[in-house]
């Protein structure tokens, strides 16, 4: 049996669902896509939460440039991102720790992360702008340092934006076909 060999399935049976979960040939690509999407969400959050905080707090030329760079992938099709990654990482370079990433496992999570940055940043920026500045000032006046205030006051108040952005990005990357088709290798079949 093969899953979805016809354009329209003839019938939805328990056998088809059973096959998805029993045969590793069918289940492994699904789990691989889940893992790569989750990696992209985590990497994107690590980048965008602090950047959203800094950009929202200070409106200077450097922060506007950072915002522009993070939002740039939104204006590019997925195929352009994939082709540029192929050109960048097809040979050994300092950016790839002196290895070629093409055909390896990490090229797809990197591509998904780049693809996800604008959506995550937008969600986190809106969440950051909705935080009452008095909360941060109160925390600082009570003796908490910048880092403690960030982790104990800012991040919990940003959590609805962080979660909604993470869910949207996860859904968007798990269904991304163009980059997957251009960048997959033996170790990362989506």
Residue ranges and their predicted role:
Residues 142-144:
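A short glycine-centered flexible hinge/capping loop motif at secondary-structure junctions
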Residues 7-22, 186-190:
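Short hydrophobic, aromatic-rich alpha-helical segments embedded in or entering the lipid bilayer
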Residues 136-137:
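Short alpha-helical segment that forms part of, or immediately flanks, the ligand-binding pocket
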Residues 1-3, 18, 23-129, 146, ...:
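Membrane-water interface segments at the C-terminal ends of transmembrane alpha-helices
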């Amino acid at each position: 049996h093969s899953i979805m060999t016809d354009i329209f399935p003839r019938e939805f049976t328990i056998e088809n669902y059973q096959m998805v979960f029993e045969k590793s040939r069918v289940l492994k690509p699904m789990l691989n896509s889940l893992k790569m999407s989750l990696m992209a969400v985590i990497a994107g959050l690590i980048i965008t939460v602090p950047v959203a905080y800094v950009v929202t707090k200070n409106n200077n030329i450097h922060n506007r440039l950072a915002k522009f760079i993070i939002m740039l992938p939104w204006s590019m099709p997925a195929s352009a991102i994939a082709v540029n990654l192929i050109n960048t990482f097809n040979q050994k370079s300092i950016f790839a720790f002196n290895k070629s990433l093409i055909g390896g496992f990490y090229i797809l999570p990197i591509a998904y992360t780049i693809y996800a940055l604008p959506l995550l940043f937008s969600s986190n920026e809106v969440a950051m702008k909705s935080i009452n500045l008095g909360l941060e000032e109160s925390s600082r006046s009570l003796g908490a340092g910048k880092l403690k205030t960030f982790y104990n006051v800012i991040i919990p108040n940003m959590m609805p934006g962080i979660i909604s952005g993470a869910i949207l990005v996860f859904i968007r990357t798990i269904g991304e076909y163009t980059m997957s088709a251009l960048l997959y290798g033996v170790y990362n079949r989506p």
